[in-house]
């Protein structure tokens, strides 16, 4: 945060919105926000019920993405992940990388390479208001 990054809510337990009752999902979001105090929200897996969206949009700015790097795939290498960034990034892209156990090894290589390439292409990084 001191370096200009923002923190957003992504639920406390990374639960899927269609697998849980709306009240359970909203409670899980609230649990996370009790700790991180964010005004941004991104739903795990990019899905949520209309009722959940309606409720959450009153308290949070909902942020989606347009490029998932697939860094979690066991079939992709770090180079493949960087190539996904190069192939699919466009002006205004919101790019998703993961820091999970499935992706962490690739993240250490792919993220710095992708950031370098993006800067070389003239892309700028901005936070949400």
Give the residues covered by each predicted segment:
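Metal-dependent polysaccharide deacetylase catalytic core of the NodB/CE4 family, i.e.
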Residues: 1-103
